[in-house]
Amino acid sequence: MLESHLIIYFLLAVIQFLLGIFTNGIIVVVNGIDLIKHRKMAPLDLLLSCLAVSRIFLQLFIFYVNVIVIFFIEFIMCSANCAILLFINELELWLATWLGVFYCAKVASVRHPLFIWLKMRISKLVPWMILGSLLYVSMICVFHSKYAGFMVPYFLRKFFSQNATIQKEDTLAIQIFSFVAEFSVPLLIFLFAVLLLIFSLGRHTRQMRNTVAGSRVPGRGAPISALLSILSFLILYFSHCMIKVFLSSLKFHIRRFIFLFFILVIGIYPSGHSLILILGNPKLKQNAKKFLLHSKCCQ
């Protein structure tokens, strides 16, 4: 018999899972229909679609972890599972990073030759960013697969067993350090791009207030809404990365409040940010409304 707090947690996990599948599915379907109609896809739509697909798989794995935690289902420990998880996790992280870089290059106003060059060519670089991420993540997975025999038992026994001994601690420590370091690279790139974008939007907002003080101008709230959207992206992305680092380096036990809270927060990022993307994109928002209205009519 499940305890009451575990039942509540599982209901929240189900809602989170369904929201993540729905929001990311909307992004994939809308951009897929546009691709079929126009035989081409805009660079931003391509990046959003790839990010949404990776988040769907990430959401599936997070829900699988929740089911394991709640119902104590046996997890199959093998290098294939470790490689798949690492591939999905790293790929989603890099694609989200490139999305932050794309927004920064398109929106921010910085008078620097390198930034101007990036601003003019960012659209053409998007396919290469995606391809480069795929190749890089694949190489990382091959590297870690050699040590999966140590990594997989370590992370699973750390959560599921209180009396576990791990062999070859030196090798394991190197792997954990490299695992955390790999998260740091996209995180630093993302932080630099998004903080630069926030600074640029904040400066633009102050200039508008000084220019049109006391008057109402159409579109005046657009920079503020964009700033809030980017700030929410930053908070979700940063908290997601930090919790992954904590789970990788510290010791927790399942069914404890802190562990359940961390897993729930990890799942908020791929669903919550995709919802923000839909609300901030007129095309995605309109198609999401059409889908909901069509679903109500079919009932």
UniProtKB/Swiss-Prot annotation:
GO terms for cellular component: membrane; plasma membrane. InterPro entries: TAS2R (IPR007960). Residues 31-55, 103-124, 200-222, 279-299 are cytoplasmic. One of its GO terms (biological process) is detection of chemical stimulus involved in sensory perception of bitter taste. It is found in: Membrane. Keywords: G-protein coupled receptor, Glycoprotein, Membrane, Receptor, Sensory transduction, Taste, Transducer, Transmembrane, Transmembrane helix. Its main location: membrane. GO terms for molecular function: bitter taste receptor activity; G protein-coupled receptor activity; taste receptor activity. Expressed in subsets of taste receptor cells of the tongue and palate epithelium and exclusively in gustducin-positive cells. Glycans are attached at residue 163. Residues 1-9, 77-81, 146-178, 244-257 are extracellular. The keyword Signal does not apply. The chain crosses the membrane at residues 10-30, 56-76, 82-102, 125-145, 179-199, 223-243, 258-278. It is a multi-pass membrane protein. Most taste cells may be activated by a limited number of bitter compounds; individual taste cells can discriminate among bitter stimuli. Belongs to the G-protein coupled receptor T2R family. Receptor that may play a role in the perception of bitterness and is gustducin-linked. May play a role in sensing the chemical composition of the gastrointestinal content. The activity of this receptor may stimulate alpha gustducin, mediate PLC-beta-2 activation and lead to the gating of TRPM5. This is Taste receptor type 2 member 1. The lineage of its organism: Eukaryota, Metazoa, Chordata, Craniata, Vertebrata.
